[in-house]
Amino acid sequence: MVALMDKIAQLFRNKQYSDLIQLIDKQLHAKNEPEALIFLYAIQGEISFKQKDWIQAFAAYEKAVAESKQKGLPTQVYAQIVQRQMIILLRLQMLDTAFGLFSENQSVSVDNVQVLAQLALLYLMCERYSEAEKLLSSIVESSTSNTITLSKQFKEDIGPFKELFGVLDTYDTFLATILNNLAICNSKLGNHTLAFDQFQQALDIIKDPEKITRPPLSPITVLFDNCVSTVDEDKEKALKVEHHMLTINESKENQEDDTVLSLLRDGCTLIPSSTLGTHLPLIIELHSTICYNIGKLELTLGNLDRSVNHFKKSIEYQPSFARYVALGLVYRDMRNFYDAAEMLTKAVDSCVGISNLCLGEVVYNLGILVSEELKMPYKSLQFFDEATVLFIRGEFSAGAILSRIMKANSLTTITTATAVSSDWEFIMAFLNTLYLDLCAFSKDQGFNVEAAFTGTNAISFNLPITEPQEKESPKSDKIASEKPLVESNPGRSRTPSSMNDVYMLSAENLSFSLLESSFAQKETITSRLFPTFQAETKRYLAILYTNLGLIYYRIGIPTYYKQARRCFEVAIWFDNDCVFAINYLSVLLLKENSKTLAIEGLLKCTRLFPEYYEPFYNLGNILKADEENKKALQYYSRAIELNPRFLDGYLARGVLYAELHRFETAYLDFSKCIELDPDNRHAFCNYIHMKQILGIFHNDTLDMRKISKIIDDYIHEYLTVQNAINKGVVLPSHPLPPIMPYHCYLYRLSSSQLRFICQRYSEQNVNWVKQNIDMMSTPLLDLSIHQRPMPPSIGLINSVSSSSQLQLSMLPLNQSAADSMVPLAMLTPGPTLCTAIGFQSIKSVIRDSQHITHGPIFSYDRALITLARSKHSSKCPISYIDIVNLKSPLRLGVLCDDINSIPIGCILESWLRNIDPKVASLSIYSTVASDKSALRTSLEAHCSNFIDFTNYKYQNNPFLCAQRINGDGICIMISMCQHNCGLEGRILAMRPAPIQISYWTHGGTTNSNYLDYILADQYCIPPGYAHLYSEHVITMPGCFICPSHSMHYSNAILLEEHADILKVTVEEVRSLIQDSKPDIDVNHHSAAGENILSLDGSDATSSSVDSGIGSRTHSEAPIGGGDKDEGAHSSKILELELELAEIAKMKGETKNGVSTNSASEGRDELLMNDRILITGDNVFFQVQPIRNGRLVGGRDRSMIKKMEPLLKAIYPLQRIASEAAVPASMEKSENNSDLTSHRVCLELPLYRKNIRALYGIPANCFLFCTFNQVYKFDMGTLGIIAALLRSVPNAYYALLKFPPASQLHIEAFFRHKAPDILDRVIFLSMLPMKVEHIRRYLAVDVFVDTLKCNGSTIVLDALWSGVPVVGFVGEYILSRKTLSFLSVLECKDLICASQGEAVLLCTRLAVDSGYYFSVRKRILKNRSNLFNISRWCDNFVLTMMLAYKNWIFGGKPTSFSTERVIANVKSQGFSWPLKSTGAQ
């Protein structure tokens, strides 16, 4: 008998089951003892159990139990047989029978404790946690009180059954297992603290096993290449399957009954079993399993770090599929994606015994992780292929289709980057096949998509999606009324935050672990896809269609938007609450100008699923476009709150913060973007720009190199795409460069890189016009009312107007899309040139606008003169002026995107006041809304044709804006906009005017074909630099910038203050300035007086005309006192009489017979005819000086509040001392005891030392300054500051808090690099009043400009104040403006070739007083060369006429110099006056 049992055990050990079955059958027919029969039946049941022959196994075990009644079985063996029977009944879904294995109301005793442990396990599997906890607690109590007896029971010899069941439990392992299961029960019941204690007790009972040395984890790159081994034949079958029936006849080994498994989803516990293989110690598996379960409990409580530690320890004891997956999912939740991918790859490599569905889902999650998070779409393809095969093996077609869709997404990403023709053909065919397969699969599920959509227009999400486009763009009132911060929907336990998260495995899919060899080990990872598909088939199909539609949309080709929309509509048809489909469909509706529907759809998303972040982001974009910035920030922040890793949300919010000048906050958002994706180009470039604005200069060199590398990579990608497009491949449009054209001049890029960036933006504008031109249907305008100004008829126009250069034939309206971009141009119906616009026929008015090659400056006046003389005899020569003058004023237009700013606004105001309207009329087109400032109000009042394109009539629509410009008959459009691909660029790309000129604001070339000229001077763009510009260069006389200082700040700094600085008399200063008296046409300034900012109350216009710019006449005494004894008494007293009580009652009333309405009509109460302000950081209020009587014109009590700080600010002036006393007092009116009237007296001038006292600057120091914005700084600028302060002992350096947040960063830089000079760096606040800013230059000795971007108005302010400016020179206009200013002032010696040379020059100015004073005198003497508005405007109008004449006579754009044209004409004996219409 012993020999027989040994033979049977050997066959069982060697898994020779066939021979063993034959032997058992033979022995069962023989006569055997009861002990032998029990063993034979147990062996027969074990073999059937391993072969999953459940009925045969249960029958064998039943016979073994029956035989045991005659011959008793050891307790451990009986417990194992009962466990097997329980497992079989669970497999057969016979729960009641399983519970029948145990006697009812059986009390716990030493004899039945092991069997009752199986009953407790059954309670756990059925989620009857309270009953399981009660029974397990009794087992623990009984076990601990009968330790000796139980120990003997576990040491009982079980004979041959030891070979059958392996190593059985000891008392310690049994008790540790019971405690583990009891801890699981308490965890499920919410007693987490007790559960932790019981887990720890279980670990304390069993001794810590000796650690096993294991090989380290393989590198991630190796793991990706060697992950899942799949037969190539299976892959080929999967790829060739047609439509939805993705089936394959594979072996179903390891395939479990999913219905039974659902009963065990969270009841996975330790089974008190001895089935552990003999090759591993039982103690190791117990430790590993308990550590895993502790990690699961920590994960449930949200302690990710602790969970990772326990999972790692579990894997260290005994690695397994479930433990690798658990650790990988935790790493993914911690955003440690590389480690997560490594763990999931390890899990796939250890997938022995795992079902195809479970393994396929893990591989699918690995593919999503690699594609979306690691940004390695090429690597993800193998995972999606493998997942497809596994789902096919598991007969889960819906999972296979989802995996194929995600593969298509990865292929699209790869193909977009490579732009290979064959790849695009493949992906398009693959997507079409996917769509057909998905439709067929839907049909098999009972949903005929094609039939449902035949004859229907769209599927609504409770909204009329197919509603026609609205004519007017809707406002965002509905969004503003919504509250973005809403509570989560309590009806759903887990709402996905993104579409990829819908069916991804998570911590919820992890269960407490069983022993490694247990039947239910695979259920430690519960499936998510298959149960969801079974429970919510329509919702699952909606997600499939949404994923497919999103791929079509992300391709970026407009022709595929229709297919994307169809997919989204089908998804909504399946699930009307599919927020993902509604969100993306709303985005498409925005592209189709269905704004109202889009907003309603997005708002529905926020109501259905408040945890979904993308609708909040899209609503934020809409609000931002509508300039609802505060609300947009709320929606962006809500999106980021819902998804803290939402890079686009941080990027959009950072851009908006930057536009709102909240630079520190923007910097933090861009820093977060870099943290999330260090390779994101747009995020990095915005991050670097914020660093420059804030003065953060660490790693500056590396940053510039990286930006250059980014642009090089971008150029390479763009050229690759363009080559493919040129070969006929249909590709999505390549995105714009990550740097704005204006900013690219700040990053030390090469000339070719700069030109390429600008060209891309220009191309984008042109392409936008091409794509959208057919959408408009505006009728033609009446030709008769849009005539251009023309020269007198001299027999020349008729021949020119009929020439081939201007005669434009009408082309068919349905011109192909391949035609070149069509500008708005001039039609030539007759001798008088006219224009017409009709968007249906714009393509028929193409004008040849190609630029000729740049060459030497060409003066075309000789050709004009020749043409004129050829038509007349020598006896009656024609004067050149007849050719120049027009029958009506030249119509100039200015397109401006920053008209509210002081520099541009002041320039335009000076044009309006100094250009003779009889010679040229000026129209202003603003693309920014009014800020209600006095400057904007003045411009709108004085410009006869001021158009605000933000008005509802134009809706920021480029077509409507271009139509208005063209309809106004503008001859020359002057662009004062930064080069962009927004509204301004699109307007210019349509060529609403025949001549378009770039002026000043961009700072370099636009590299476009729709801007003909760039306005410059001989210093900004000398002939040797013309090749850097695509535009033709118009060289103006003098400086190309028009400084308006002489009009706006006539005598902001008084003669006495100049004399004090130069240490000369007032008469010498007056003589110095009067020597440079310009030749000014007084008529041009007839209306300028009311806008001049004067300190003494005099009329600044007459002052500048009669006695030189900046001087003051003897005839006009300042307010508050005469000028009778000017040599002895140089101070001027300004008296301000303020009616603090009565002023509020004067609205519409009269006082002392004087009407108040006429004085204040149409003007700001605080901005009267003459203006005065008091110097000091705390005084920002403008007050009208009183000549006669009391102040009138106040309108409400708010004016009183504005006056109060002014009065209070007078008191600090009492502490300012000067050689002549500077009294400041507030005197109470003797006749008014109730303080209703006050008189304020302030002595002027204040002189340098008093100005310095106000700003906290040492009185006797030598003050350098750089008042440019900090983004213009670089490391060289900071190096100059440090070098100057070290080389000049008594020097201080003043910087502006421009922006305020930059101060901390610059101070930190000097504290680290040059702490010895930090206390001599002074930071001054920005002043809201320009005159006060100019007066602050009284405290400055030398202004040091910046190299990479020169200052503009800030440098002109310094020069107007007489402060020497040390400048640099670069390549483009942006870095050559200071050269132009100083050259006109005959101060070229202040231009430096290097920063080292600048330090030497500045040092010389500081130590050589003779040289310093000579420079200041030279600036004052020559400043009329730079600041003469009248002369500049005359030259400007003349230049515009020359450009227009060139076009009139059929000439193509060509570079020319106005000065040389005039000189050439005069050399021919012709005169050159400008005649107005009336003079002819």
Swiss-Prot record:
<feature type="region of interest" description="Disordered">
    <location>
        <begin position="468"/>
        <end position="497"/>
    </location>
</feature>
<feature type="binding site">
    <location>
        <position position="1357"/>
    </location>
    <ligand>
        <name>UDP</name>
    </ligand>
</feature>
<dbReference type="GO" id="GO:0005737">
    <property type="term" value="C:cytoplasm"/>
</dbReference>
<feature type="binding site">
    <location>
        <begin position="1351"/>
        <end position="1353"/>
    </location>
    <ligand>
        <name>UDP</name>
    </ligand>
</feature>
<dbReference type="GO" id="GO:0097363">
    <property type="term" value="F:protein O-acetylglucosaminyltransferase activity"/>
</dbReference>
<feature type="repeat" description="TPR 1">
    <location>
        <begin position="38"/>
        <end position="71"/>
    </location>
</feature>
<protein>
    <recommendedName>
        <fullName>UDP-N-acetylglucosamine--peptide N-acetylglucosaminyltransferase</fullName>
        <ecNumber>2.4.1.255</ecNumber>
    </recommendedName>
</protein>
<feature type="repeat" description="TPR 5">
    <location>
        <begin position="613"/>
        <end position="646"/>
    </location>
</feature>
<keyword id="KW-0802">TPR repeat</keyword>
<comment type="pathway">
    <text>Protein modification; protein glycosylation.</text>
</comment>
<dbReference type="Pfam" id="PF13844">
    <property type="entry name" value="Glyco_transf_41"/>
</dbReference>
<feature type="binding site">
    <location>
        <begin position="1333"/>
        <end position="1336"/>
    </location>
    <ligand>
        <name>UDP</name>
    </ligand>
</feature>
<keyword id="KW-0963">Cytoplasm</keyword>
<comment type="function">
    <text>Catalyzes the transfer of a single N-acetylglucosamine from UDP-GlcNAc to a serine or threonine residue in cytoplasmic and nuclear proteins resulting in their modification with a beta-linked N-acetylglucosamine (O-GlcNAc).</text>
</comment>
<feature type="binding site">
    <location>
        <position position="1269"/>
    </location>
    <ligand>
        <name>UDP</name>
    </ligand>
</feature>
<feature type="compositionally biased region" description="Polar residues">
    <location>
        <begin position="1099"/>
        <end position="1112"/>
    </location>
</feature>
<keyword id="KW-0539">Nucleus</keyword>
<dbReference type="Pfam" id="PF00515">
    <property type="entry name" value="TPR_1"/>
</dbReference>
<feature type="repeat" description="TPR 6">
    <location>
        <begin position="648"/>
        <end position="680"/>
    </location>
</feature>
<dbReference type="GO" id="GO:0005634">
    <property type="term" value="C:nucleus"/>
</dbReference>
<feature type="repeat" description="TPR 2">
    <location>
        <begin position="113"/>
        <end position="146"/>
    </location>
</feature>
<dbReference type="InterPro" id="IPR011990">
    <property type="entry name" value="TPR-like_helical_dom_sf"/>
</dbReference>
<dbReference type="Pfam" id="PF13181">
    <property type="entry name" value="TPR_8"/>
</dbReference>
<feature type="repeat" description="TPR 3">
    <location>
        <begin position="176"/>
        <end position="209"/>
    </location>
</feature>
<feature type="repeat" description="TPR 4">
    <location>
        <begin position="288"/>
        <end position="321"/>
    </location>
</feature>
<dbReference type="InterPro" id="IPR037919">
    <property type="entry name" value="OGT"/>
</dbReference>
<dbReference type="InterPro" id="IPR019734">
    <property type="entry name" value="TPR_rpt"/>
</dbReference>
<keyword id="KW-0677">Repeat</keyword>
<keyword id="KW-0328">Glycosyltransferase</keyword>
<dbReference type="GO" id="GO:0006493">
    <property type="term" value="P:protein O-linked glycosylation"/>
</dbReference>
<feature type="binding site">
    <location>
        <position position="1272"/>
    </location>
    <ligand>
        <name>UDP</name>
    </ligand>
</feature>
<feature type="compositionally biased region" description="Basic and acidic residues">
    <location>
        <begin position="468"/>
        <end position="485"/>
    </location>
</feature>
<comment type="similarity">
    <text>Belongs to the glycosyltransferase 41 family. O-GlcNAc transferase subfamily.</text>
</comment>
<dbReference type="InterPro" id="IPR029489">
    <property type="entry name" value="OGT/SEC/SPY_C"/>
</dbReference>
<keyword id="KW-0808">Transferase</keyword>
<feature type="region of interest" description="Disordered">
    <location>
        <begin position="1093"/>
        <end position="1128"/>
    </location>
</feature>
